[in-house]
């Protein structure tokens, strides 16, 4: 019984009991009953498989239609007119440009306690955290730009986060 459909059929206790009865003491009635149950089970499996493939094919066709319509009828917001300047020449939006111009992580923090904790970090910790969280740089990219090892940058990053956690915990204890 290596066939997965047969295994699945026999996983039902009722089917297995009937199969066992037919194998131990074969009789025409039980054999026909087992055969009918298996035919019904197999028919259901085929219907489920058909429905599954139809759903998959329909979803692929739907995606194709949506992409075709988007290509055929693009939104006017996606393509600014010649006089409009919604995005820069590099293609980034205005918000990303604003973030790129801001090189201090503390300028992006709205929580005053977090702001104070960031202010107490070393310049190198601030720099690493800014590059990771504002610019999305990897540890390796930061290490290359600062001329240090990836492991050292990772340690600076961890220590910076640890210092922020300690500062916030100390501030919370002071409030209680």
Swiss-Prot record:
Q: What induces it?
A: In the mid-exponential phase of growth under acidic conditions. Positively autoregulated, in the presence of RsoA. Down-regulated by YvrL under nonstress conditions.
The lineage's top-level taxon is Bacteria
Database matches in Pfam families: Sigma70_r4
Query: Which BP terms does GO give this entry?
Result: DNA-templated transcription initiation; regulation of DNA-templated transcription
**UniProt cross-references to CDD domains, sorted A to Z:** Sigma70_r4
Q: Which residues bind DNA?
A: 139-158
Against InterPro entries, the record matches this protein to:
RNA_pol_sigma-70_dom, RNA_pol_sigma70_r4, RNA_pol_sigma_r3/r4-like
Q: Does the keyword Transferase apply?
A: no
Which residue ranges does the UniProt annotation give for the motif Polymerase core binding? 30-43
Q: Name one GO molecular function term.
A: DNA binding
**Subunit and interaction comment:** Interacts with RNA polymerase.
Q: What is this protein called?
A: RNA polymerase sigma factor SigO
């Amino acid at each position: 019984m290596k066939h997965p459909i047969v295994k699945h059929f026999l996983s039902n206790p009722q089917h297995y009991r009937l199969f066992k009865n037919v194998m131990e003491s074969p009789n025409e009635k039980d054999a026909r009953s087992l055969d009918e149950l298996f035919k019904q089970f197999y028919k259901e499996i085929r219907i489920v498989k058909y429905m599954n493939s139809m759903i998959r094919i329909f979803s692929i066709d739907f995606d194709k239609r949506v992409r075709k319509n988007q290509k055929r009828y693009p939104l006017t917001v996606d393509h600014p007119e010649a006089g409009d300047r919604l995005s820069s020449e590099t293609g980034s939006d205005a918000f990303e440009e604003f973030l790129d111009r801001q090189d201090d992580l503390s300028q992006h923090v709205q929580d005053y306690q977090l702001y104070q904790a960031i202010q107490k970090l070393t310049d190198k910790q601030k720099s690493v955290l800014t590059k990771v969280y504002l610019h999305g740089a990897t540890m390796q990219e930061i290490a290359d730009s600062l001329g240090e090892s990836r492991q050292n940058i990772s340690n600076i990053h961890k220590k910076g986060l640890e210092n922020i956690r300690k500062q916030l915990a100390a501030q919370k204890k002071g409030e209680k």
